[in-house]
Amino acid sequence: MSSGGLLLLLGLLTLWAELTPVSSQDRPKFCYLPADPAECNAYMPRFYYDSASNKCKEFIYGGCRGNANNFKNRAECRHTCVASRKGIQPRIASN
């Protein structure tokens, strides 16, 4: 196969991988943790992924401890944990 053909094949495979629907197995495990507001005195609106509804929901974070299912905004939560119907795969957040 020519180098042009290989490049075309690589491009098609990459496109296919991006458009393939996501299964819950591709979601990071911390997305399944419950919201953990912690018991400190801060009042920080945050978002967590709710696996029962496949949605990111707001909660109030106390500012200490907690777990990794804690995002500063809804967009970050969605990008990391929500299985999109459009086939965009979630990614592991780098906190």
Swiss-Prot record:
It holds the Pfam family Kunitz_BPTI. The record marks 41-42 as: Reactive bond. GO terms for cellular component: extracellular space. Disulfide bonds join 31-81, 40-64, 56-77. The keyword Secreted applies. The modification Pyrrolidone carboxylic acid is found at residue 25. Negative results: does not inhibit chymotrypsin. Monomer. This is Kunitz-type serine protease inhibitor PIVL. It comes from Macrovipera lebetina transmediterranea (Blunt-nosed viper).
